[in-house]
Amino acid sequence: HGQKIQDKAADAGVTPKEYVDKIVATVKDLWKLLDVSYDRFIRTTDDYHMESCQKIFTKLYEQGDIYKGEYIGHYCKPCESFWTDSQLVDGKCPDCGREVYDAHEEAYFFKTSKYADRLLKLYEDNPQFIQPESRKNEMIAFIKQGLQDTCVSRTSVKWGIPVPFDPKHTMYVWVDALSNYISALGYGNETYHDYDKFWPADLHMVGKEILRFHTILWPAMLMALDLPLPKRVFGHGWLLMNGGKMSK
């Protein structure tokens, strides 16, 4: 889901679903080539996942952790990240160095700032929660500079899960994607029943460019939902080709 896929599909002259279906086919072929088997191929376009996400979003809204407002700032389409003026580096995305564009639209926000102190306490009480140490220090510095509430919906993006009580909005792709960790286990749906068996996760192994989502936004969401947190998050570096990050 998200604007990046929506725009790529439009450029290719196909629907977003048709566009991602082709990518899924190549990923499955890659697993065969690598002799990798799996119990279930999980996609965020699955109906059960949509059901779970809508329940999560509604619960957070009803308990006051999500509110409606207006987003005015910048957006990096490749990273799918929102940024303020002060966070940009030479006017560009601080994560990838690409151009950002101005964004101004009605949106819902998650009260990430409400959980800043709890997140810092989490890192202090559980020093192994974020690894390696250098990445943990980056996340602490990010929070201490002033944690902003997170824009969690878009009206300009149609390729996404609709907000159930305000369907002109679709959920921000990272709220959708992170929720997949527990929706695939059956949280918020009756399709699967593995949540108690497999959650919390022992480890999230993620690229360093998405560590912020996994160690700030995701734990804050879980705290708001009163759910257990993953035990550790490891932010690994990149495989490089010609001096640049290999695309995932």
Where do the model's predicted regions map?
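Structured secondary-structure scaffolds
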Residues: R40-R43, Y48-S52, P78, C96, ...
